[in-house]
Amino acid sequence: MKPVHERSQECLPPKKRDLPVTSEDMGRTTSCSTNHTPSSDASEWSRGVVVAGQSQTGARVSLGGDGTEAITGLTVDQYGMLYKVAVPPATFSPTGLPSVVNMSPLPPTFNVASSLIQHPGIHYPPVHYAQLPSTSLQFIGSPYSLPYAVPPNFLPSPLLSPSANLATTHLPHFVPYASLLAEEATPPPQAASPAQSFNKSSSATSPPGQLPHHSNTQPLDLAPGRMPIYYQMSRLPAGYTLHETSTAGASPILTPQEGQSALEAAAANGQRQRERNVRRESEALDSASSKGESQGLVPVVECMADGQLFSGSQTPRVEVAAPAHRGTPDTDLEVQRVVGALASQDYRVVAAQRKDEPSPLNLSHHNLDHQGEGRGSARNPTELVEKSQARVFYPQSHQEPVKHRPLPKAMVVANGNLVPTGTDPSLLPVGSEILVASSLDLQARATFPDKEPTPPPVTSSHLPSHFMKGAIIQLATGELKRVEDLQTQDFVRSAEVSGGLKIDSSTVVDIQESQWPGFVMLHFVVGEQQSKVSIEVPPEHPFFVYGQGWSSCSPGRTAQLFSLPCHRLQVGDVCISISLQSLNSNSVSQASCAPPGQLGTPRERPERTVLGPRDLCDSEGKNQPSGEGSRVGEPSQPEPGAQACWPAPSFQRFSMQGEEARAAMLRPSFIPQEVKLSIEGRSNAGK
């Protein structure tokens, strides 16, 4: 017979019973303590129920708690009713069994045989694994296929105890849950329910003793809402991307505590790679521009060459440094944060070399630094000349042309170098390509008053687009024609319809080499007055000859730059000129070698007018009288195929009548009235 208190205890629920600890239980506790010594790392993982062996008189089960609760004298049926157990904090009071089993009502597929309870004479129901409490580790499977290969030492040591044997073959399929990775290596905080959305958290620095391969390789750019990903160990040298995982002997520069200095250190370690990449980049850029930018390109060239990204974009294998498709958009934001940090340290982004990247960095994206400077350098024309000349005169350059902007007069570009007009011509390299913009003697002298009485040809920042093959020219009759299809009759009819203009002729009497390299000097006899005019033009500049069409001193170079078929200009050729009809019967002629549609600026002398689509910066850029406020013609855009308006409609629309026009034409000038004409470039008429 059992004592009365034992029988009364059986009628009570398990939680209400008094559970005295007998000497037998104490003995078993002592023996079990010698068999299993819990470690501090395993304390969070060994919470559960310890099932004790049974004696001849009945089953005795000790619940691991604070040592204050125990169940004695339970029958097998009563024992099977136990399903919820207490959670021990850090110590155990097992009853001498060789194994410790976590218990919980899980599906039957997780049940284990009762052979864990070593008693051959009694049949016991199956023992269940205990469900992990809310404070313990939880794993979730990725809702998408992970592109990351997780190494065996993926989890920090506070999360897995040495006694927990989790198959390493399953590890690549798990990712740490959000709250398990804390800012410091503290006990695991409360984890959210697995039903919650997948969140990312900051990384924790794991103890160095348990993770020898990853103890010093935490990601550098971590913020709330980001999840660190541990990659396979990299076998690359230290000069590559910063987020790679190195071997056990990794350099300490990659520790999170030195994240800021790691950027500089990694840049220093990759010096050889950068030098190799700088040479590769310099082949793609113009020599002058790349030399000026080389110091700023060094840190970033390492990023862009061969598709590498200096921000350490995350990929399945760190050895492949090109950005990969990511499962979540948050990782793209991580890259932006790192790139932003680099930009704040005065790193220059040259993503424009990558044409296929829409780049959120922008790395953005895709513009060169000097290109942006060229667009905004109207206040500094000298800098614009220096930066844009390579785009203009070297078609093989990969840089895009910029819009035309007015340039200072009397400046020379020789082989990409800006040369003042006072420079001795003998100092300029022979064969250097110099383009000229039309300039008045007065303006040239005002620019360099003390240097030279007769200024040299002035610079041009781009090729005139209206000479490009396919450019559309609008005649005075309203008809549109391509520049290569123009004929002599088109000029004649346009001058007749215009009213204020008349066709004149300019005969070539001599062609000489100019004192300025890259130019030729042409001598003309113009109009009825047989005025002698000398101009200096590039040899590729086209002229329109009666009955022949476009001609130039160098047809091959004209075809190369403009794709415009030309004949060779020779002595005796008669070029088309347009004369402005004078109201007082004094003809002020304007010799022309270009079709209608000339660009004009209102700053030049009042008596000047223009014929043809000549460019402002090219030697044929001529201007309408500023006093009259008229402009002979103007192409819409300085680009190939752009439409250029013929001078006549604009002239009629803006020209002034009566005494105002008469006064403007009789205004005194430095050149005599009867020889006031200009075909293109600088004119020596009347000197």
Swiss-Prot record:
<dbReference type="GO" id="GO:1902035">
    <property type="term" value="P:positive regulation of hematopoietic stem cell proliferation"/>
</dbReference>
<dbReference type="GO" id="GO:0035176">
    <property type="term" value="P:social behavior"/>
</dbReference>
<protein>
    <recommendedName>
        <fullName>Ataxin-1-like</fullName>
    </recommendedName>
</protein>
<dbReference type="GO" id="GO:0003677">
    <property type="term" value="F:DNA binding"/>
</dbReference>
<feature type="region of interest" description="Disordered">
    <location>
        <begin position="1"/>
        <end position="46"/>
    </location>
</feature>
<keyword id="KW-0539">Nucleus</keyword>
<feature type="compositionally biased region" description="Polar residues">
    <location>
        <begin position="198"/>
        <end position="219"/>
    </location>
</feature>
<dbReference type="GO" id="GO:0007613">
    <property type="term" value="P:memory"/>
</dbReference>
<comment type="function">
    <text>Chromatin-binding factor that repress Notch signaling in the absence of Notch intracellular domain by acting as a CBF1 corepressor. Binds to the HEY promoter and might assist, along with NCOR2, RBPJ-mediated repression. Can suppress the cytotoxicity of ATXN1 in spinocerebellar ataxia type 1 (SCA1). In concert with CIC and ATXN1, involved in brain development.</text>
</comment>
<dbReference type="GO" id="GO:0031208">
    <property type="term" value="F:POZ domain binding"/>
</dbReference>
<feature type="compositionally biased region" description="Basic and acidic residues">
    <location>
        <begin position="1"/>
        <end position="19"/>
    </location>
</feature>
<dbReference type="GO" id="GO:0005730">
    <property type="term" value="C:nucleolus"/>
</dbReference>
<feature type="region of interest" description="Disordered">
    <location>
        <begin position="587"/>
        <end position="649"/>
    </location>
</feature>
<feature type="compositionally biased region" description="Polar residues">
    <location>
        <begin position="28"/>
        <end position="43"/>
    </location>
</feature>
<comment type="subunit">
    <text>Homodimer. Interacts (via AXH domain) with NCOR2. Interacts with ATXN1 and CIC. Directly interacts with RBPJ; this interaction is disrupted in the presence of Notch intracellular domain. Competes with ATXN1 for RBPJ-binding. Found in a complex with CIC and ATXN1.</text>
</comment>
<comment type="similarity">
    <text>Belongs to the ATXN1 family.</text>
</comment>
<dbReference type="GO" id="GO:0006366">
    <property type="term" value="P:transcription by RNA polymerase II"/>
</dbReference>
<dbReference type="InterPro" id="IPR020997">
    <property type="entry name" value="Ataxin-1_N"/>
</dbReference>
<keyword id="KW-0966">Cell projection</keyword>
<feature type="modified residue" description="Phosphothreonine">
    <location>
        <position position="328"/>
    </location>
</feature>
<dbReference type="Pfam" id="PF08517">
    <property type="entry name" value="AXH"/>
</dbReference>
<feature type="region of interest" description="Disordered">
    <location>
        <begin position="356"/>
        <end position="379"/>
    </location>
</feature>
<dbReference type="InterPro" id="IPR003652">
    <property type="entry name" value="Ataxin_AXH_dom"/>
</dbReference>
<dbReference type="InterPro" id="IPR043404">
    <property type="entry name" value="ATAXIN1-like"/>
</dbReference>
<dbReference type="GO" id="GO:0000122">
    <property type="term" value="P:negative regulation of transcription by RNA polymerase II"/>
</dbReference>
<feature type="modified residue" description="Phosphoserine">
    <location>
        <position position="282"/>
    </location>
</feature>
<dbReference type="GO" id="GO:0003723">
    <property type="term" value="F:RNA binding"/>
</dbReference>
<keyword id="KW-0238">DNA-binding</keyword>
<dbReference type="GO" id="GO:0030198">
    <property type="term" value="P:extracellular matrix organization"/>
</dbReference>
<feature type="compositionally biased region" description="Basic and acidic residues">
    <location>
        <begin position="272"/>
        <end position="283"/>
    </location>
</feature>
<dbReference type="GO" id="GO:0007612">
    <property type="term" value="P:learning"/>
</dbReference>
<keyword id="KW-0678">Repressor</keyword>
<keyword id="KW-0804">Transcription</keyword>
<dbReference type="GO" id="GO:0007420">
    <property type="term" value="P:brain development"/>
</dbReference>
<feature type="region of interest" description="Disordered">
    <location>
        <begin position="261"/>
        <end position="294"/>
    </location>
</feature>
<feature type="region of interest" description="Disordered">
    <location>
        <begin position="185"/>
        <end position="223"/>
    </location>
</feature>
<dbReference type="GO" id="GO:0005654">
    <property type="term" value="C:nucleoplasm"/>
</dbReference>
<feature type="region of interest" description="Self-association">
    <location>
        <begin position="20"/>
        <end position="197"/>
    </location>
</feature>
<dbReference type="GO" id="GO:0030425">
    <property type="term" value="C:dendrite"/>
</dbReference>
<dbReference type="GO" id="GO:0048286">
    <property type="term" value="P:lung alveolus development"/>
</dbReference>
<dbReference type="Pfam" id="PF12547">
    <property type="entry name" value="ATXN-1_C"/>
</dbReference>
<feature type="modified residue" description="Phosphoserine">
    <location>
        <position position="359"/>
    </location>
</feature>
